[in-house]
Amino acid sequence: MSFDPDTDIIEQTCKSLIGCKINIGFTITLNNGETMSGEVDNCNIVGDCMEDILFPFIHKHIDTFEPGPKQASPDFYNADKQWEWELKCFSNTPGFDVSNFNSYISQLTTNLERKMYKTQYLIFKYEMKSGIIAITDFKLCKVWEIINYTGKYPISLQCKKDMWYNIRPCSFNDMVKDKTAAIFITQLCKAITLTPNKLENKQKIIEDIITQYNLMHQSNMHLNIDSNTGGVAIFPNKSP
């Protein structure tokens, strides 16, 4: 399965920011011409600001790299929108949203390749002190590498009012390369079976997802799912 051919350049560019310090400031000009400047000390805006900060660094090396739509997914495109990139930032413990659960399932049923293989995640860890953002670590991940599969639910997610709301990440240290797309598909299909959310025709959703996966990997994965227990048996021909 192919990924963005510029992945290595993007990863090295992002890694070069580890250790850097970023000051987010503001200047106000009043009607009388008086100005006032200061520093922004609010971690809630770091993610949005990082989009504007990161873009020119990558675009300098890759002229086909471009911003995505504001307040919508993805954060960046590459190669005439053929590849998608999502930016995630956190301090202390990852708590960002990967995607809305129902929305992600819907997108997978229509274009699994784009959401799983043509989208990658740029994940920055930072500290913020006195208005200064210090980038302390970075990882470039596939979606299946940032999910936890050993918790209360088949995949790590946020539950609100007994409904499964947003898909959430695992710990930063647990974002590792030995997780596989097959595990992600297996656990996701189990989640579709068990979710209390209203999803029309869960079995067809699962079949659509598995069919796309098999076509891309030329495999013959079968999922036997017990609708009462959510038990899953997976039989792939080969690992992705």
Regions found by a protein language model. Give the residues of each.
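Active-site beta-strand termini and strand-to-loop segments that position acidic
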Residues: F76-K81
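Nucleic-acid endonuclease domains
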Residues: M1-A72, W83, C89-P240
